[in-house]
Structure formats: C-alpha cells, structure tokens
C-alpha cells in the first residue's frame, strides 16, 4: 500500500520473502501500489523464484476489500536523510482495519508500531528478527488479533483532534 519506489524498498521485502519461502513458511505477499520500481520488482520476484508467492495488485482503492485479505502488513522502508519522514499512511490504514504491522524502524514509525503491542518494529536490516516477528504472528492468530486491535486504538488516540492540537501547540512552545 504505497508508492513502489526506492524509499519504500519493497525489494527488501522480496528478499525476506524468499528466505521465508525457503524455510517452508506459509506466506504470500500482496504488493499494493504503483511506481517506477514495478518492473524491477516483478523481475526480482521471478529471479528469486517466488513469483508464485507474490501478487502485484497495482493501485488499490478498496481498502476494506484489501485488508480482508491481509493478515499482517509488512513494511520495509529505507529512508535516508529527510526522505520519508513520518509514518506512512499504510501503517495508519492497517490500524484502522485491525491489522498488525511488522516494519523496519525508520522515520518515526516506532511512535505508531510498538514492538509487542501493536506489531513489531525491527531494526533496519535485521532480516532474522523480521522473519521471526512474521512467524510469531502466523503461528499465533489470537496475538495477531490483539495487536491489530491495539494498533487500531493507538491510531485513534494519536490521530484524535485533541492529540493533534496538543502536539501542534507543543511544537510552537519549543
């Protein structure tokens, strides 16, 4: 659920998916979005031999339909400098649909994805921890549900009018 560009770094998720498939994990990846990296990502999936495990959906407008098919939102951004500052809409949307997130900890994401509560925020490049987090959520659907609901509540709290006002005023009082 994002632009398919180098900052969103879906190519990193394809590498992780290959490792998961090689371990026999029951995984599929739905890539939602359009962008300059689409052809490269399709070629990478084919080169890795995982094209049967990856579906490229293009732009998705029906978020309800999309999230009915998604158990976990995986997110592998690679933000350098000021690129991609802040939390992506995909994480907010996952929260609204009670979907836990496994993500690299980049650009303030840890404010939304709290490891062990609303999903897992993994240090950038730690593929083993990323795989372990996904595996935990696959094996424990009740935990997946709890984390999804916790993310929903957290999104509602952080995006409330009162919280936006409070943080805006705090920024001006610095």
Which positions does each model-derived feature cover?
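Active-site donor-binding acidic/aromatic loop of nucleotide-activated sugar
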Residues: 37, 51-60, 66
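Short alpha-helical segment that forms part of, or immediately flanks, the ligand-binding pocket
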Residues: 64, 88-96, 110-111
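A short, well-ordered alpha-helix in the C-terminal region of glycosyltransferases
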Residues: 129-132, 136, 143-158, 164-170
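Short hydrophobic beta-strand element within catalytic cores of glycosyltransferases
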Residues: 100-103, 113, 121
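A structural motif in glycosyltransferase catalytic domains
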Residues: 13-14, 29, 130, 168
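Conserved acidic donor-binding segment of nucleotide-sugar-dependent glycosyltransferases
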Residues: 115-116, 120-127, 136-141
């Amino acid at each position: 659920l994002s632009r398919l560009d180098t900052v969103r770094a879906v190519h990193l998720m394809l590498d992780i998916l290959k490792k998961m498939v090689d371990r026999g994990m029951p995984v599929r990846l739905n890539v939602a979005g359009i962008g300059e990296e689409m052809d490269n990502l399709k070629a990478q999936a084919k080169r890795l031999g995982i094209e049967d495990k990856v579906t490229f959906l293009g732009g998705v407008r029906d978020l309800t339909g999309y999230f009915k098919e998604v158990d976990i939102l995986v997110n592998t951004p690679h933000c350098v400098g000021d690129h991609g500052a802040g939390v992506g809409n995909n994480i907010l949307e996952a929260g609204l649909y009670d979907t836990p997130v496994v993500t690299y900890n980049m650009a303030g994401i840890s404010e939304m994805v709290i490891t062990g509560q609303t999903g897992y925020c993994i240090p950038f490049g730690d593929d083993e921890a990323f795989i372990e987090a996904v595996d935990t959520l696959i094996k424990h659907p009740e935990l997946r549900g709890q984390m999804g609901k916790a993310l929903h509540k957290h999104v509602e709290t952080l995006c409330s009018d009162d919280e936006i006002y409070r943080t805006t005023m705090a920024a001006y009082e610095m």
